[in-house]
Amino acid sequence: MRISHTLLNASSKFRTVFDFGERQVAHWFPGHMAKGLKQMRASPRKVDCVIEIHDARIPFSGRNPLFQENLDVRPHLLILNKMDLADTSDKMSILKQLERDGVKNVLLTDCLKQRDTSVKKIIPLVTDLIENAPRFHREENRSYCLMVIGVPNVGKSSLINAIRRTNLKKGKASRVGGEPGITKAVLTKIQVCERPVIHLLDTPGVLPPKIENIETGMKLALCGTILDHLVGEDIIADYLLFSLNRPQRFGYVERYDLETPSDDIQHVLKCIAVKLGKTQRVKAITGVGDITVRMPNYTAAAYDFIRAFRKGELGKVMLD
């Protein structure tokens, strides 16, 4: 949205650094993920190519180092999914940085889109990577096996379904959900292509037990790879406001009927609660006894603010 010079001048006083205080990011490594990682480590011998999928809004943050121990033994393709939610105006700089980090094969996708042209490129690219790998032995009627890995809620199951939809014209094979960790067990082989015959394994996303720093953890939480209540909707909402104000993404002002951009999360949440009618009854103690008053429901407002961001309703953002 367009913002006047007066408003831009006001925003120049906003925070340039986010104060995390003494907060600690949740240690989130459920049992099924540890089991999945153990099985994943035992699988590369059966796998011809590893497809790593990650959120395009955080192309560098949170890529799991535990995965990378397993990537060197087989060809590797990085898919940055949810590109419809990401500001990719600086795409070339991102690709160059990834190449410096040793990642040469990258595709940007929107796997929920019914006809994403990038999804059509996956099987030809993977086939080429496998057949040109040093360890490849050509055999008649050979079938290939792929493994999809990534942190929670980046679209692994959506990717599998998109590949099947594109190459087999078949329906869903993997359950899809908006919460991290919905794929609870390493699945058996799922066929995704007939020519050549390609099967694919789906694994649980495995978030590393130790996150590099608190800001990396907050970016992961904002993108929904950590269950909200483990971090706190209030802190996620505040970090979201900070992340929108920094690049002057002020779409929330018009959406929630604010007069100007704000750096005060309590003020923003109050405006959201009023706009959406999110209130709650609370008891107030007065000189004449207890009375019940209606107050803004800040938790419900924070939830709507975060949900709107994750659905792309506050504009495209690059967090890294």
Curated annotation (Swiss-Prot):
Say which domain of life the source belongs to. Eukaryota
GO biological process per UniProt:
mitochondrial translation; regulation of translation
Indicate which residues the UniProt annotation says bind GTP: N81, K82, M83, D84, N153, V154, G155, K156, S157, S158, G205
What cellular component GO annotations does this protein have?
mitochondrial inner membrane; mitochondrial matrix; mitochondrial ribosome
Query: Which SUPFAM superfamilies does the annotation name?
Result: P-loop containing nucleoside triphosphate hydrolases (SSF52540)
Q: What is its main location?
A: mitochondrion
GO terms (molecular function) for this protein are: GTP binding; GTPase activity
Keywords, A to Z, come to:
GTP-binding, Membrane, Mitochondrion, Mitochondrion inner membrane, Nucleotide-binding, Transit peptide, Translation regulation
Domain CP-type G positions: 37-209
Q: Where in the cell is it found?
A: Mitochondrion inner membrane
Membrane topology term reads: Peripheral membrane protein
Give the protein family: Belongs to the TRAFAC class YlqF/YawG GTPase family. MTG1 subfamily.
Its biological purpose is as follows: Plays a role in the regulation of the mitochondrial ribosome assembly and of translational activity. Displays mitochondrial GTPase activity.
Descriptive protein name: Mitochondrial ribosome-associated GTPase 1
Organism annotation:
Ictalurus punctatus (Channel catfish)
